[in-house]
Design a protein with these regions (language model features):
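Rhodanese-like catalytic fold shared by cysteine-dependent sulfurtransferases
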Residues: 2-6, 15-48, 54-90
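Structural scaffold elements adjacent to functional motifs in cytosolic proteins
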Residues: 8-10
Length: 90
């Protein structure tokens, strides 16, 4: 079987996202609380997710939450966008 396409998930605020993001990232703000969980639950649980924020703290929380919700393949991009050496869309 083919590997599902990984999803890049940015859990920062919309303002932070608009100031620069990793290509193809989708933005769901962790700080929305219940709204975050609601939106996360609409995603495909079978896909791998690469989760990032500014420095890695919020994404670590998001990864834990997603695992609790049944997402099996979630990865925290350590160091966040600050440490990201790839392309950033501004």
């Amino acid at each position: 079987t083919e590997q599902p396409e990984p999803v890049v998930l940015d859990v920062r605020t919309e303002e932070e996202f608009e100031s620069g993001y990793i290509p193809n990232a989708i933005n769901i703000d962790l700080r929305m609380g219940p709204g975050f969980i609601e939106q996360i639950n609409t995603l495909d649980k079978n896909k791998p997710y690469y989760v990032y924020c500014r420095s890695g703290a919020r994404s670590a929380q998001a990864v834990q939450l997603m695992r609790d919700l049944g997402f099996n393949e979630t990865y925290n991009l350590l160091g966040g966008i600050l440490e990201w050496e790839g392309e950033v869309i501004e």
